[in-house]
């Protein structure tokens, strides 16, 4: 059994940026990230369109899980808005929420996103056209990294973190239990304890997280899904 100051469950954007902030602001802390999937460079879906044309139900899906989360192979769009994409502002206020989104954008630019464009719907011809037709186009600023740059940013963030944060890949967490002074995190490899536990398992882990919250008597609510 190992003891940590902080265990982060999930190496998607939430887990990565939590680890980054801890490494920057409190480097003396012992931090670990437990991720069910593979490191970024080992995330390979076996579907090739030739020999394998459909899902073979891998034990851990390389598209959904692994360093970078489900968006690792996306076109890297980061939305800066309170109008959709979650309700963080309900907990910390709209201004602070936007400030934090801009902070994430600064980190993405710093780690490889220089030269990528920021787009906005505000004041555009499309916005005016929507208003004329009684449609409400939600305002947002959008950083478009692109698939290749998004991958580079993730590579650079991992290179920054790997020497100060312990990453455990292919490490599926079965349960989280409250104990005196912290939490016990149970995996197939054993039991580890920590003072603080950050759970950031994304959409694919939402049902598991709901059960953990129920066991720990943490209230939850359903969030809308943006399409």
Question: Model-flagged regions — what are they?
Answer:
Residues 66-116:
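Dinucleotide-binding Rossmann-like beta1-alpha1 core, especially the glycine-rich loop
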